[in-house]
Amino acid sequence: LDQSSRYADLSLDEDTLIRNGKHVLVAYIMKPKAGYDYLATAAHFAAESSTGTNVNVCTTDDFTKSVDALVYYIDPDNEEMKIAYPTLLFDRNITDGRGMMCSFLTLAIGNNQGMGDVEYGKIYDFYLPPAFLRLYDGPSVNVEDMWRILGRGTTNGGLVVGTIIKPKLGLQPKPFGEACYSFWQGGDFIKNDEPQGNQVFCQMNECIPEVVKAMRACVKETGSSKLFSANITADDPEEMIARGKYIMSQFGPLSENCAFLVDGYVAGGTAVTCCRRNFPKQFLHYHRAGHGSVTSPQTQRGYTAFVHTKISRVIGASGIHVGTMSFGKMEGDASDKNIAYMLQDDEADGPYYRQEWQGMKETTPIISGGMNALRLPAFFENLGHSNVILTAGGGSFGHKDGPKIGAISCRQGEEAWKQWKAGQFGNISLSDGVIEYAKTHEEIKGAFLTFQKDADQIYPGWKEKLGYTGESSVQAASFDWAKRASAAAFVGASVAPAKKENVVARQALDQSSRYADLSLDEDTLIRNGKHVLVAYIMKPKAGYDYLATAAHFAAESSTGTNVNVCTTDDFTKSVDALVYYIDPDNEEMKIAYPTLLFDRNITDGRGMMCSFLTLAIGNNQGMGDVEYGKIYDFYLPPAFLRLYDGPSVNVEDMWRILGRGTTNGGLVVGTIIKPKLGLQPKPFGEACYSFWQGGDFIKNDEPQGNQVFCQMNECIPEVVKAMRACVKETGSSKLFSANITADDPEEMIARGKYIMSQFGPLSENCAFLVDGYVAGGTAVTCCRRNFPKQFLHYHRAGHGSVTSPQTQRGYTAFVHTKISRVIGASGIHVGTMSFGKMEGDASDKNIAYMLQDDEADGPYYRQEWQGMKETTPIISGGMNALRLPAFFENLGHSNVILTAGGGSFGHKDGPKIGAISCRQGEEAWKQWKAGQFGNISLSDGVIEYAKTHEEIKGAFLTFQKDADQIYPGWKEKLGYTGESSVQAASFDWAKRASAAAFVGASVAPAKKENVVARQALDQSSRYADLSLDEDTLIRNGKHVLVAYIMKPKAGYDYLATAAHFAAESSTGTNVNVCTTDDFTKSVDALVYYIDPDNEEMKIAYPTLLFDRNITDGRGMMCSFLTLAIGNNQGMGDVEYGKIYDFYLPPAFLRLYDGPSVNVEDMWRILGRGTTNGGLVVGTIIKPKLGLQPKPFGEACYSFWQGGDFIKNDEPQGNQVFCQMNECIPEVVKAMRACVKETGSSKLFSANITADDPEEMIARGKYIMSQFGPLSENCAFLVDGYVAGGTAVTCCRRNFPKQFLHYHRAGHGSVTSPQTQRGYTAFVHTKISRVIGASGIHVGTMSFGKMEGDASDKNIAYMLQDDEADGPYYRQEWQGMKETTPIISGGMNALRLPAFFENLGHSKVILTAGGGSFGHKDGPKIGAISCRQGEEAWKQWKAGQFGNISLSDGVIEYAKTHEEIKGAFLTFQKDADQIYPGWKEKLGYTGESSVQAASFDWAKRA
C-alpha cells in the first residue's frame, strides 16, 4: 500500500515538533529501490518503524494512529528523510520507568533495515526532547573525576596521557604488570585493550594483582595517582558483575582509580547499562570496537559514527573512543571534532539537529589509533582543546627510549601546543613551534627521532632545525625484562630468558612475515582443533598490497601493533592470528585465531561471544588501509564450541506443549499482534483471544513491552486470560512470546519473573523475546541463564545495518544467525528467503540448515555441532497462506515457526480464519508433496486443495496480488469472478464483547466518538470547572488540592493551558482516544481556580488517581509527585509551573506513615521529659571530609564533653580514608567515655545513604551492631533529596525505632526562588513530614549563612503543629507526629537568641559546626556557649533583665558566663552586627579578632 496518507505529514513544522517535545526526531539518508516513489517508500519506512503493517488489519483503532511515526520532511534529490516518532511509542523499564536505548534502536533501525523497497537507509542524526532525554541516566562519572583523582581540579584538567599495553594480546600476567609499571613511571592511564580480560594464558585472577602491585609502587615512587581501565565485558551480565566485584576487591582503596571497560558495540547497550547501574562510581570506558561494521562511510545502513557516539552519552558512557579525526591511523576526518562537541558540550549542533543536554554529564572523547607526541599538537589545534583521554600504544611503548619517556613525550606534545597557542614562540607555524619546544625537551625530541615518517610529513625540515644528521630510522628501546627485575618487589616480576630479542625497526612494517603463513593447511588446522577459522571478503585500499594488508588485518585482530613495541616476547607470538589463505582476485582472506586468544568467564570458564566478535570484527573495521572487510563464515573447533551453552529449549519443546511429539511437528502457526504498537491492554488481550481461536503462537513485536499506554502489569494479565479461555475452548495449548528486552539486565530479570508469576502453571507456554541485535548478546545470555527453561526468542531487528548485502562490513546474515545458535537462542528470525517482503534469497535456506542440522556446510566451512541443540528458524515479513507452500518446498520441510501478522489479521474473515488458512498452506504443500493431486505443479496443487477449504480460499480472495503472482489463472480455476480486492474483516471491539468473560473486555458506550483531528485541543471543557468551591472540596475529602504559580508561554490562553496542565497531570492525552469512558472522566484532575494576573492556579486531584502499594495499600509520595510535577514540567505551552502548597484530605493523609520517632524521643534519652525539652545542641564534625577514624572519634569525644548531638555530614559514610568499619567503633568508644564522664546521654546521627537500598540496610544493621545497647542513641541520616523519597522510606520501614534524620542537600536545585519549576522549600519540608522524616534541615530563616527569610518560620510551624497554615491551605495533621526542624549553616551562640525570638520557641535541633569547633576555647566550650544562647533568650523572655532589648539582655547574661562571652570574642563580626556597643558593655579592649583554639590531637588523647 501507499501509506503516505497515514504515515507522512509534510505540513509538520520541525521547530513546532521540537517545542512540543512529544516526538523523537530522526534524520536519515534513504534511497528507495529503482521504480519506487520516494514519499511512498518513506511512509512505508515510517510504518515499518512504528505501527504499520503491509496490509490493513482489523485491529487498528484511533489510538493506534495517534502513535504513528510520521515522515515530516523529504528531499529526494539529496536522499534526505526525517521521521518524527511519538515518545509514547518507546518501551520503558517496568522497574523504574526509565528509557531504553534498545527500544529506540529497535524502532529507528529495526525492521526497516531489511525492507524490500529500500535500497538503503542510515541514521545521520537524531533529536531527543527534554522530557524524553531525562528518562535516560547519562554518565555518572567522567573525565572530571579522573582529573580530580590526578590532582588537577575538575575543569580544564587537560590531556590524560594513557596507553594500551602492547601487544594487545600475548603478554602473561607478570610481564603485563611490568609493562604497567614501566609506563606509569611517566603516564597517567592504562587500559586493557578491547579483547583482553581472562584469557587462559593471562587469567584475571593472576593479572589484576600484578596491575595493583604496579600501581601501588608507581603511586609511591612518583607521588602521582595512576588510573587503570579493566575490561569486564562478557556475554553474561552476571559474569560482568562478578568481574567488576573481583577487580574492586583487588584494588580496594584504589578502586576509584579503576575504570571498567565495556566493548559496547559487540556486547550491546545492555552490557553498558549493566556496568553503569552495578558500578555507578566507576568510569565507564565504552570501547566501540566493531562499530565500523555499521558506521563506516562505505555503507549506507545503520547509523553513522556521530550517531553511535551520541547514543553513548545518552546511555551513560563516561568516555568513548572517537577515532583520531584524520590525525591517526584510523578512518576519520578533521570535521569529526563535531562528535567531540556533541559528547562534551551542553548544547551542540549535529548534522541536522541541535541537542540540548540539559546538564547531563559529558562523555569524554578517548583518542587512539596511531597517535604519538608528534601527531597530538595538530589534533588539539583542530579540536580547540586538549580535554581528552589518550590511549597511545605505539606512541609510548614504541618510543625509542621506552614507555616512560614515550608517555612524557605525549604530555610534552600537549604542552608544546599550549605554549605555541599562548604565543610564546612568536608568530610562527604550529609545526615550527613544536620544533622550538623540542629543542629543550629531550623526550619529545626523541619522538622525532623515533617516528621519523610522521616527522617528515608534519614537520618539514625538522632534521635541519633540530640539528639531526643521523640515520633515517632509529630503533625502539629494548624493554629488557631482566633489567626490569629491579621492579620485582613491586610487580612480582620474573626475569625473562636472556636470549630474547625484540629490538626491531620502527617504521610502518609489512607484517606478513609474522602474521601470515600461507603454507598452513586448512584441513590440518581443523584436525588440530586449536584455532577458530574465519573467512572474510576483504579489499585493501588503492595502492596497498593484499598480503601485507591481510597481515595487518590479522595483527590488528590479535597481538599486533602499528610499530614494534618493547614488550613482545616469544609467548606473545605463539598466540598471533595468522592469515593462512588469500585470493586477491576474489577478495577472499582466511585467518586462523588461536583459541587461547579468546576471553573466558571468570565464574565458570565458559566462552564469550563478545570476545570472538571483538577480535574478528573489532578494530579491523576502521583500518586506514582496508576498504572493507566482512565475515562470510567461521568455524569453531569441537573443544572450543563446547565452551558455549547453545540452546536449552527449542521448537521440540513447543511441539511437545502443542501435543505433537518432539520430531517433525511441523509449522507452528503464529502471529504478531497488529498494529505492533498502539493497542491498549484490553484490545491487545482481545486480539490474542481472536487469533488463538485458530492459531498456536503469538509474539510481542520487538518494540512492545511496557509502554505507558500498554503497561506490562495490565497487558500480561489480559494475555493470560485470553490464553486460558482459548485453551479451554479449543482444547489445544497456546504459546506466547513476551518481550523482556531492556537496557538493564536487572530490569530484564524483573520482567521475566513478573511474567512467569502471571502465567503460573502456564509458564512453559510462555517464551521470552529478546531484541538480540539492538540489546546485544549480553541480553541474550542474561535471558538464557536466568530463564533456562523458557524458549528464547531472538529477534534480530536492526541486523540489516550490518548484514545487508549492500555493505561489505561486519558479517553476513548467515554469520549472524550461526552466532545465535552458539550463544543459545531457541529460535531466531531468518527472513523469508525471497518468499516474503524482506530482503533475501532462496539460497538462504542454508541459514536454516546451519541452525537445525547437526552438521552443515556454510559458504566456506563445514560445522559439526556435536549434538548442540538446534535453533529454530522463525519466519515473518509479508507471509501468508499463499506464500507458504513455495517456501516449504524451497526449504524442504515445514519445521519452522511462523509469525504472520498480516497473514492472519489481514485475512478478510479475521485472525482466526487467517491462522487456519496458514495451517492449510502447510497441509496443501504436504498433500501435493505426497502426490495426492497427481502430477501437477505446486501452484495447481494448492488451488486444488483450496477448492475444498474455505479458509485458504479466503486467502486467495484477500491477498489477490500474491495470488496473481504465484498462482496464475487462480480466478478461473476457483471460479472467482468478483472484485479485484477484498477488505479485511472489521475487528469490531464491541462485537468482541462475547470474549468479555475471558479477557475482561467491556463494551464501549455507543455514544463514544473517538475519531478526531490530530491537533492540540482546548481541554478546558473537561479539565476545568471554576464553579467548584474550595471549602466544599475540602469538606468532601475526595481530592488532593495543589496550588501552583503557573505561566503559559506567549500566545497561549491561561485557562486552556491550565486545563492542559491538569490533563497532562492526570488522564489526558493530546488527542481524544477510543478508550475514554465515564469512569476515566471521574478521575480527571480539575482546575478549580485561576488568577492569571498573579499567575495562580489551583488543581483538584481525585485521591483515586494516586498509586498505592501492592503490599499494604499505603500511599506513595512518588505517585503524588509524578502527577503533580511530572510530565507537566516539560510541556510545550507552559513557561513554568511550581507547587507553592498542597492539601491532603484526612482519609488520604492516613495512608502515609508519618514520623515514627522525633525530638520527643531525643529529649527522653537526654533526660528532659517529652515536652518542651528545648534545644538539642549538636554539631557537624569539621572538616566534613578528611578526618581519619581516630581523629574523627577524638573530635566526637571533645564535642560531647559539652554538647548533645553529632551528625555525620551528608557526604560522610564510608570513604576509603575513613571506612565505616574503622570509624564507627571509634565513635562508639567516644560516646561511651563521654556518657560515663559527663553523666549525660549523647546522640549520634550516622549517614546510611546509598544508591542501593540493600546497601542502606546493610549499613544500618552494621551500625546498630556496633552501638549495641546504645542503639537508641543513634539516628540514621539519609540524604533525602539526592537519594530520593525511596531512600527515606527504606530507612523508616527497616529501622522504625531510629530517629530518621532527613538531610536536604541539593534541594535548592528545585526549591530556590530563582526558579519557577518543581516546588518550593515549604512544599519540600511539608512532604518530609508526610513521608516520615523525624527531623529535617530547614535553613536558618535569615539568621545564618543560608538563603532564607524570617517568614520561613511557617515551615517550622507546618512541621511541628497539629494544624498549620501554608501559603494557600490550612493542613490538619490529625495527630500525625511532628517532624523536628534542624538548623545549621553559620549558627553560633550569638545568632541563636534572635532566631528563637523569631520562631517563638527553641524546640529545634542545632548542628553548628563552626559555632562549636570554631570557638576560641574549643568545641566543648563552643557547645556550652550555644546552650547558654538559649538560656539567655529564655531569661530575657521571662523579664529577668528588665525592660531592655534582646541584644542587651544577652550581653547582661554574658557578663556572668564565660563561655558565651568567649563567643563574643571569637565571632566578633557577628557581635558587631547583632550587639552594637558590646565591647564597651563587656569591657573588652583587646584585638579585633581572636583565633580559634588550636585543636591539638595529641593533647586530646
UniProtKB/Swiss-Prot annotation:
User: Record's superkingdom?
Assistant: Eukaryota
InterPro entries in the cross-refs? RuBisCO, RuBisCo_large_chain_AS, RuBisCO_lsu_C, RuBisCO_lsu_C_sf, RuBisCO_lsu_fd_N, RuBisCO_lsu_N_sf, RuBisCO_lsuII
User: Which residues are propeptide?
Assistant: 486-508, 994-1016
User: What reactions does this protein catalyze?
Assistant: 2 (2R)-3-phosphoglycerate + 2 H(+) = D-ribulose 1,5-bisphosphate + CO2 + H2O; D-ribulose 1,5-bisphosphate + O2 = 2-phosphoglycolate + (2R)-3-phosphoglycerate + 2 H(+)
Its Enzyme Commission number? 4.1.1.39
The record's PROSITE patterns line, in alphabetical order, gives: RUBISCO_LARGE
Family matches, as Pfam families: RuBisCO_large, RuBisCO_large_N
Where is the catalytic site? K166 (proton acceptor), H287 (proton acceptor), K674 (proton acceptor), H795 (proton acceptor), K1182 (proton acceptor), H1303 (proton acceptor)
Residue numbers of N6-carboxylysine PTMs: K191, K699, K1207
Q: Residue numbers for the site described as Transition state stabilizer?
A: K329, K837, K1345
Quaternary structure per UniProt?
A: Homodimer.
Q: Which PANTHER family match?
A: RIBULOSE BISPHOSPHATE CARBOXYLASE (PTHR42704), RIBULOSE BISPHOSPHATE CARBOXYLASE LARGE CHAIN (PTHR42704:SF17)
Q: What does this protein do?
A: RuBisCO catalyzes two reactions: the carboxylation of D-ribulose 1,5-bisphosphate, the primary event in carbon dioxide fixation, as well as the oxidative fragmentation of the pentose substrate. Both reactions occur simultaneously and in competition at the same active site.
Anything else of interest in the record?
Answer: The basic functional RuBisCO is composed of a large chain homodimer in a 'head-to-tail' conformation. In contrast to form I RuBisCO, the form II RuBisCO are composed solely of large subunits.
Which named protein is this?
A: Ribulose bisphosphate carboxylase
Native source organism of the sequence: Symbiodinium sp. (Dinoflagellate)
The gene name on file is rbcL
